[in-house]
Amino acid sequence: MNYEEILQTVRGFCAREKLLDGKKHLALAVSGGADSMALLRVLLELRETFGYPLTACHVNHGLRGETADRDEAFVRAECARLGVPLTVFRPADVGMTVPPHAGEDWARRLRYACFAQLLAGGIDCIATAHTATDQAETLLFRLARGTGLHGAGGIRPRRPGYCRPLLGLTRVETEALCAAFGQGWVTDETNESDAYARNRLRHGAVPALRSVNDAAEENLARFCEKAARADAYFARQAEQLLSIARLDAAQTARKAPKAKAAWRLEPLQDTDPIILEAALHSLVAPVRDAEEKYIRLLAELVERGSGAVQLTDTV
């Protein structure tokens, strides 16, 4: 696709998913990489169409020494050049310190702590630069670990406080967009390391799939969209099921005095397995990552009618 076609793809995706409608103040998470720099330029182009004020934020995790400082300096310079207000975060700004063996999970928690501070301070949406390539990698990663329909839905285009305008583009297309704008970017050297499972998929599985079909990433991302729609439907059915099965306060106090809530087994045992799975997912998700193995264990428990499953140290 050429520049105009890529821009139109993003515009159409944002309009279809209602990602930018009515945003009072939009903040873009900018790492300095090609994806986030492409999103910065796209959001500047679309600002007039959707009418949102735009600011940027950058998180210096403090993990990569001089190259992290280089990335921060690059983002500062580019935002100043483009006239975009920028907020830079470091761990101490949100009351966090770098642990001895900080990894991807810690870095993600830091980023979302920074985003939460912005949302609490008046920003009503954080735009992140996830792409169709990220979507494909996420799907493969979850399938390899074991996932259900909810996990197969991948990265959602939006959730409260967040939107992902580039989910319709591949990483090749974001780099092409940067080239069309004459926009430079920086490269995080940790993305080249196969020490991380996601990077091994990025360097091995995704290119192998692309060799089978040039549109492999787009097709995997499209599958995620379909899975997410199916998951949303079954979640609505599950909500109705749990409402029917739930005991009232007096019944709960009598049958399960230590429980905050309880449900009758019969409706759960009589329902379709995929609706039961959706119901169990909604119950598990608030207390831990709803991995497939826990849903499966709980489904077996419902079928048996008695027993226990340990989900966390306290649940």
What is each of the regions a protein language model found here?
Residues 145, 149, 171, 210-214, ...:
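Alpha-helix boundary/capping and short turn/kink residues
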Residues 3-35, 53-59, 91, 110, ...:
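AMP-forming adenylation/ATP pyrophosphatase catalytic core
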Residues 1-207:
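Core alpha/beta nucleotide-donor-binding catalytic domains of modification enzymes
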Residues 191-198, 217-228:
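Internal, active-site/partner-interface "lid" segment
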Residues 203-220:
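Conserved anion/nucleotide-ligand pocket segment
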